[in-house]
Amino acid sequence: MVMTAEAKAKVIEEYQTKPGDTGSPEVQVALLTARIKYLTDHFKTHKKDFHSRTGLLKMVGQRRNILKYLKSKDVQRYRDLIARLGLRK
């Protein structure tokens, strides 16, 4: 696993909507974003790691689907999350 338990707990604590929340779209997107950022840095030094690149593409697609779901359910939460994570410019 890429993230340590402490780093994962920190991300969950920052983005949870209520105590003990680990499955809300905000938390899921934040965890995927942290893993995507790590892998992006990883590819700067390991340019030929194509196996991990396929995993990265799956994570990006999964994050896109969760964001699309959140946008269809609650646009304001979607916009807040995008702003907090700095995804769209």
From Swiss-Prot:
rRNA-binding in keyword set: yes
SMART domains cross-referenced by the UniProt entry: Ribosomal_S15 (SM01387)
Alphabetical list of Pfam families matching this protein: Ribosomal_S15 (PF00312)
UniProt keyword annotations, A-Z: Ribonucleoprotein, Ribosomal protein, RNA-binding, rRNA-binding
GO molecular function terms attached to this record: rRNA binding; structural constituent of ribosome
SUPFAM superfamilies listed in its UniProt record: S15/NS1 RNA-binding domain (SSF47060)
Superkingdom of origin: Bacteria
GO terms classed as biological process: translation
Presence of the UniProt keyword Cell membrane in the record: no
Gene3D superfamilies to which the protein is assigned, alphabetical: 6.10.250.3130, S15/NS1, RNA-binding
Gene Ontology cellular component annotations, sorted alphabetically: cytosolic small ribosomal subunit
Entry's family note: Belongs to the universal ribosomal protein uS15 family.
Role, per record: One of the primary rRNA binding proteins, it binds directly to 16S rRNA where it helps nucleate assembly of the platform of the 30S subunit by binding and bridging several RNA helices of the 16S rRNA. Forms an intersubunit bridge (bridge B4) with the 23S rRNA of the 50S subunit in the ribosome.
Subunit structure: Part of the 30S ribosomal subunit. Forms a bridge to the 50S subunit in the 70S ribosome, contacting the 23S rRNA.
Name of protein: Small ribosomal subunit protein uS15
Gene for this chain: rpsO
